[in-house]
Amino acid sequence: IHSSAGRRALVETPGSYGLIGANGAGKSTFLKILSGQLEPTNGDVVITPGQRLSFLQQDHFKYDAYTVLDTVIMGNKRLYEIMKEKDAIYAKADFTDEDGIRASELEGEFAEMNGWEAESDAATLLNGLGIETDLHYSQMADLTGSQKVKVLLAQALFGNPDILLLDEPTNHLDLPAIEWLEEFLINFDNTVIVVSHDRYFLNKVCTHTADIDYGKIQLYAGNYDFWFESSHLLIKQMKEANKKKEEKIKELQEFISRFSANASKSKQATSRKRALEKIQLDDMRPSSRKYPYIDFRPNREIGNEVLMVENLSKTIDGVKVLDNISFTLGHDDKVAFVGANEQAITTLFKILVGEMEPDEGNYKWGVTTSQAYFPKDNTAEFDNDLTITDWLTQYSEIKDATYVRGFLGRMLFPGEDGIKRVRVLSGGEKVRCLLSKMMISGANILILDEPTNHLDMESITALNNGLIKFPGVILFTSHDHQFVQTTANRIMEILPNGTMIDKITTYDEYLASDEMAKKRHVFEINEEDASDN
């Protein structure tokens, strides 16, 4: 891929290129220009002739009239057109000689494109992402939002494209699907350009990192961690070089000022003037990246009794999402709830904060505890006409506007933003408001349901560090692998039948544990036996 500005090569060799930058830096816009969805204001994009480009569609309703399998095969537009034209010819009642010639031509092209393997290849992608075989002939309109995301991702991956563009491919994917995608991309031989806020994902799949800052792209031959270390080292080296140059400039200026009027030293002064003119300080323009300051400080230390849950059960729409759940929390527990059963996790969190009643069982918070809750669906929180400042003030014991604005400032809301109406905030801004609310509460128990959704990488990093330092108890769920691994010291997984696995361990150790895999396998075997019966 080349840009017309100086015919600069953006991608010269196959590999996986991670495109990073602050929110608003232009990552998604750049991908849309590469894919032809947007026209550039200046210049153009040249792709090597004969190469096929595929990209992840963002419109989840575009294919509602088609089957799941057809939607995936549409990832190779020409192959799908051949299939449909071929089927239309064979369906004719009056099949002519011309139809026979055309059908023969199509069959030849179809065979060259491995058309006979198309359905099985599409099915393999769907199964890998967690779309079971019995859904492959369903209409897209009948699928859930998360299932549609997986189908559209399979569409982008279908047919071994030469260039693959993925904008936030891990959004709304469960962890098994993310792991499958990681392995797929690691083994993918062609070019991938991916935008993601998932640091673990970028580290695992990317061979190169392209950093967008102030409209310019800087390419690094390494993954996200390599970029982070290299870019910081480069800034450090530039600062040191500038310091030496500034010292040299001062030395030359002093000599010139002292001896420029001295006849015997005039030649030396002139020489130093030329030397001074040649010294150029490196441009140290600060990055457009901004990190919020996230610091949860409990008003009260937690006692020994934190939370006791006994025999908790809940059925929703005829499905038992929680089945006899029991556990006890200690005062230093940071619990990550993992697995594909997201409804069960959200239900448990809602019960624990009093928004929902269990069908059976009970729970009890310790007398020294206070809870702050981050809901997955925050619509109700912002369904009002309050300004940001007034919205946060209602949750603060101290009603002083300056005090409240201090918390907003830490979350990248400058003074003038305080008069914005919360109803019109972006997804990321609403998340930062909710985190401000949790900080100002002084709670010693934090319950967070998918807090990393809608956040940029800088905010995720800041939240990650804030939770690591937090001296209280945390219950949370997230699809960000590194976020879970670095925050949690205990893992709970609610299985599809509503029962739970509970293990004091890190996330990576949990995934690698044969014992945990065996428990899941026993559950799957029992489910299959029940289905057979």
Feature names for model-found ranges:
Residues P292:
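Conserved catalytic-core segments of large NTP-driven translation/proteostasis enzymes
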Residues I1-N242, D295-N533:
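ABC ATP-binding cassette signature C-motif
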Residues E117, S264-Q268, K278-S288, K364, ...:
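Proline-centered turn/helix-capping motifs that create local helix->coil transitions or kinks
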Residues S230-D283:
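Intracellular alpha-helical coupling/juxtamembrane segments of multi-pass membrane proteins
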